[in-house]
């Protein structure tokens, strides 16, 4: 960040980045979070803590300027895939007990985020496999197999399963014809059915889901899904109390500690396990509209991209899916991933506009070729 701000070549484009559609929506969303502190009942420490979690939005325009070099973008994406490769290797070593671990699918943060990032890694590896030739295509294809194995045979995060399926479907529809993509999705469904028959962890997590649903039907809400539903319902009650502005930044955690709405859980909960309910409860309809505008600006701008459009669409779809069951913009490394990947993609846009500006400037200073022609004298 400091090197970008202090380097004249990069810093001259920062104002342009902030003045873009995505730069403005990110800034407005952050400023509204700051403004929402004025009506929050939470202690100042909690308010500042939440403001800090949204501050990553300000990184987006600044980081985008640092990704104007295509080689930098390429190295960054391949660096991410290398990190996912290491993650898969560590996960496999855990699964065969070479590295002792309670949950082999949890390599960093938790199994949900590990599955999220590995599923995205499978998508990116598949994208590069389509775009590459020769040994590189083979290498990326092998990485697709490795990441698929981690998600479907080791990871215990159900979000990862859903994300993997949707991203692979998205990849097919982007890279091949519609008819072939439909056939590919049908084959993907068949693959999931076959994997279910041979994957103990997939069977176990599906069985857990069915058990949770049965427990809910038996009026026992204190299960994995039941807790989430209770958290969502509590966030909904906070939102309905202040539908337009919410209860203010940091208000969810503080209100939960006072009300203790889920006795079996206790009095400490940072978030309602949903970015959408978190936004509605703390910042109301206004905050939700601003969040949708921010995400919408990313999608709209993706249509202007060429090289990195599939990358941005992939992380955007992954974020929107993950936000249903987790507060990933605030309380997850996936929030940083959205910002960094979006910035990487928008670096292409800044590069294009800079090149166009230089080309126009060079054209304007060209001498009039007809000035010395006697016919036109």
Please report, for each region that a protein language model flagged, where it lies by residue.
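Aromatic-anchored transmembrane helix interface
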Residues: 22-31, 43-66, 84, 88, ...
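Hydrophobic transmembrane alpha-helices and their immediate junctions
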Residues: 25, 178, 282-317
